[in-house]
Amino acid sequence: MNVKIESSWQQRLQEEFDKPYFEKLVNFVKNEYGKAHILPPGHQIFHVFNSCPFQNVKVVILGQDPYPNPGQYYGICFSVPDGVAIPGSLSNIFKEIHQDLGKPIPNSGNLDRWVKQGVFPMNSVLTVRAHETGSHRNIGWETFTDAVIKKLSEERENLVFMLWGSYAKEKASLIDTDKHLILTAVHPSPRSADYGFFGCKHFSKANTFLRSRGIEEIDW
C-alpha cells in the first residue's frame, strides 16, 4: 500500500504498510472520515513522522490517544496549536521542566520546536472520533505503532524513551535496554502527576544521557 509519509519512514515501514492488518485499518479509518468527525484531519495523521525523519529521532515520548476535542490534536502527542489552551497533562509537563531545568513555562502548548530537535512524541493510536476518547483503539493502530517502536529500537542506538503511565510502560518490552535509556513515571495527568511525575527529572536525565553519548541535548 502506498502511504504518504516522509521518505526515511516510508523506507522502514513499507513492510507494515503492505500487511493485511494495515489495509483493514486504512479502510476502517477512511470509512470513519466519511461518516463522522475524525481527528486529526487526514493530512495530519502522520505529522510527527513527516516533521522528524527516522535518523533525527533522539527522544521518544509515547502517549495513548489523541486529544478528542476539535482544534487540539494535529498529529503530535501532547501538543496543541498556538493559541489553544494548554491541556492539564501538558501543563504538568511544563511545570516539571521548570522544576527540573529552571526553564520558564511557555505560553504556547505547541511542541513543534521539540520535534525539530529530535523529540518524537507519538500516540499509540493515531486517530479518534471527536469527543469520544479511545474510540479508535483496537482497530490496528497499536500494531502499527508497536512496529515503529521496535524499528527505532532495532535500527537506532542511544535513544531515550519516556514512558509515562501504565499503558506506556507496557511498551518497555519492545525496547532493547542494552542500546537505549528507558525512563518511566506515572502519567502527567492532573489525576496522577503528584504521585511520581513531579520530581521525576526525566528531562535533565535525558540530556545527561545524550551528552554522555556525544549527542546534542534537547533545549526543552
Swiss-Prot record:
Pfam family, one: UDG
Gene Ontology cellular component annotations, sorted alphabetically: cytoplasm
GO biological process per UniProt: base-excision repair, AP site formation via deaminated base removal
GO molecular function annotations of the record: uracil DNA N-glycosylase activity
Source taxon at top rank: Bacteria
EC number of this enzyme: 3.2.2.27
Signal sequence coordinates: none
Active site: D65 (proton acceptor)
Coiled-coil intervals, chain numbering: none
Main localization of the protein described in the UniProt heading: cytoplasm
Database matches in InterPro entries: UDG_fam1, Ura-DNA_Glyclase_AS, Uracil-DNA_glycosylase-like, Uracil-DNA_glycosylase-like_sf
Subcellular localization, as worded in the UniProt entry: Cytoplasm
Catalytic activity: Hydrolyzes single-stranded DNA or mismatched double-stranded DNA and polynucleotides, releasing free uracil
Keyword field: Cytoplasm, DNA damage, DNA repair, Hydrolase
Family indicated by similarity: Belongs to the uracil-DNA glycosylase (UDG) superfamily. UNG family.
NCBIfam families given in the database record: PRK05254.1-1, PRK05254.1-2, PRK05254.1-4, PRK05254.1-5, ung
Function, as annotated: Excises uracil residues from the DNA which can arise as a result of misincorporation of dUMP residues by DNA polymerase or due to deamination of cytosine.
Protein name stated in the entry: Uracil-DNA glycosylase 1
Organism of derivation: Bacteroides fragilis (strain YCH46)
Gene (name only): ung1
